[in-house]
Amino acid sequence: MTWRATVLTLFPEMFPGPLGISLAGKALAARLWALDIRDIRNSATDRHRSVDDTPAGGGPGMVLRADVLARAIDAAETPPGAPLLLMSPRGRPLTQSRVAELAAGPGPLIVCGRFEGVDQRIIDARGLDEISIGDYVLSGGEIAAMALIDACVRLLPGVMGKAESGEDESFSHGLLEYPQYTRPQEFEGRVIPDILLSGDHAKVAGWRRAEAEALTQERRPDLWAARATQNPPERKTNG
């Protein structure tokens, strides 16, 4: 079964966007994955194609209606077990491990929020899993959905040149990725570390590991702390 991303949006013209170029675009053209874009307004029932209304209890902005989204979700042709996601700044953070889970499945249905948000009743009624790509607010969920889809597509079989490419990247082992270098050997007085040119694969691997650990401790102490919790040091015993 081909991995398929189904996207519900008020702006279908935004897609495929960046998903139509580079790795994701080539894989899409090669039918290694599929993209199904659905206009939420097609599920509206009035002549104005209304999809939102004012917030109950008052307040600024508009809220996407539960009944319209329910029709859009129910009309989507998603395989059994497909995750139902809502891109939302209040959702659980998207992690590389979650991306790997999504890439291993049939592909998600993704609701792209707009305005002030989505009626909570559709989230509860359809069991939408709210996903966030960061602690900031975008104009809508489309860009966030593209980021999620791109992260998943890269992990699909046949998309990247080498299977191990995805295994050495940032977050794959709870660490940020080590520094990368290529020719020329010297650039503005800065040279490639000698160990990377030594041909000693064990030493290269050790250097990369040490650099990844140092970067993670410096830039993402939260990741380092979580890693330490998940992988506590082994206790030495006398014997």
Swiss-Prot record:
Task performed by this protein: Specifically methylates guanosine-37 in various tRNAs.
SUPFAM superfamilies: alpha/beta knot (SSF75217)
Superkingdom, natural source: Bacteria
Protein name: tRNA (guanine-N(1)-)-methyltransferase
Family: Belongs to the RNA methyltransferase TrmD family.
Segments of this protein annotated with the region Disordered: 218-239
Swiss-Prot/TrEMBL catalytic activity: guanosine(37) in tRNA + S-adenosyl-L-methionine = N(1)-methylguanosine(37) in tRNA + S-adenosyl-L-homocysteine + H(+)
HAMAP family, sorted: TrmD
Keyword Cytoplasm belongs to the record: yes
Molecular function terms, GO-annotated: tRNA (guanine(37)-N1)-methyltransferase activity
One of the protein's GO biological processes: tRNA N1-guanine methylation
Pfam families in alphabetical order: tRNA_m1G_MT (PF01746)
Annotated source species: Nitrobacter winogradskyi (strain ATCC 25391 / DSM 10237 / CIP 104748 / NCIMB 11846 / Nb-255)
A single GO cellular-component term on record: cytosol
Keyword annotations of the record: Cytoplasm, Methyltransferase, S-adenosyl-L-methionine, Transferase, tRNA processing
EC id: 2.1.1.228
Binding site for S-adenosyl-L-methionine: G113, I133, G134, D135, Y136, V137, L138
UniProt-listed NCBIfam families: PRK00026.1, trmD
Subunit structure, as described in the record: Homodimer.
Subcellular location: Cytoplasm
